[in-house]
Amino acid sequence: NGYYLKLALCNKFSLNSDQIILGNGSNDVLELAARTFISTGDEVIYSKHAFAVYEIVTKAVGGIGVKAKPQEDFGHNLDEFLKLISEKTKLIFIANPNNPTGSLIEKSKISAFLSKVPKHILIVLDEAYDEYLRDEDKSIAFSWLAEYKNLLISRSFSKAHGLAGLRIGYGVGSKEVINLMNRVRQPFNVNSIAQTAAIASLDDDDFIIKSRLINDQGRLQLEEVFNELKIEYIPSYGNFISFNLGDETKAMMYYQHLLKNGVIVRLIQNYEMPSWLRVSIGLKDENNTFIKYLKSFT
């Protein structure tokens, strides 16, 4: 049951253990939410350019995905979410910051949104990239749990904590929501090595601060080059930047050129952004390698 990791999370964030569920990555938590609360024919709302897993887990359990039109800056349009709520709506996925756009919703807007959503609809707030945010932008979602029993917050150790290969994440919600999810969860879904590493990482604030600093520096490095080359990009609050090459053919040409030179970027056609690529922010030398081959093809 992950006793010691739950204890560490309780001490870190002033939570109770019955508010926490552990997952084989936060992806597991998202899937557990879908399997627990969605039945065949139920509707699930998420943004058009949101994390692909939302659609995958919705379809896997027989749910119907309802895509909300994004804002002009590709961010979540919460007013559109509200318009799409119907009698069949059972769950809403919101990523903040969002993948692959890197956009961020202001805390005040999320708080106002929560107050308008019917209480029987579960709201899953995916905060996998929260550790990359500046202190003034960081989530205060845990403080909303007392008022909103229909809120589930998912977090990950795969990003700023650097434990992606170990597969460890967690969800935080009301004890009622967590109890229902635990009935669906496989009893041994998280291995002991991942739990031990996660406990250690929770105590290593210096590493998180360093990771955020390096990420901030790398983001500025890449943004400067995109501005120089007049390449459109989405200002990002995560550890990646999505940039637009104008059309799908050109995006594929750049993708293949970079790949041949040992630089792996992400095609995001499946996010309905066919002319865009997403590049992860790396160390300075890694970013320089990307920049070198980006410029050599421009």
Please place each PLM-identified region on the residue numbering.
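PLP-dependent enzyme catalytic core of the Aspartate aminotransferase-like
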Residues: 108, 248-249, 253, 257-261, ...
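PLP-dependent aminotransferase-like
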Residues: 7, 36-94
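PLP-dependent aminotransferase class I/II
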Residues: 150-234
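A short linear hydrophobic-aromatic micro-motif
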Residues: 18, 153, 229-232, 263-268
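Active-site pre-lysine segment of PLP-dependent enzymes
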Residues: 78-87, 100-123, 127-158
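Short acidic capping loops at alpha-helix termini that bridge into adjacent secondary structure
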Residues: 16-20, 40-43, 88, 120, ...
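Conserved PLP-binding catalytic core of the aspartate aminotransferase-like
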Residues: 72, 216, 228-261, 277, ...
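Phosphate-binding glycine-rich loop
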Residues: 3-43
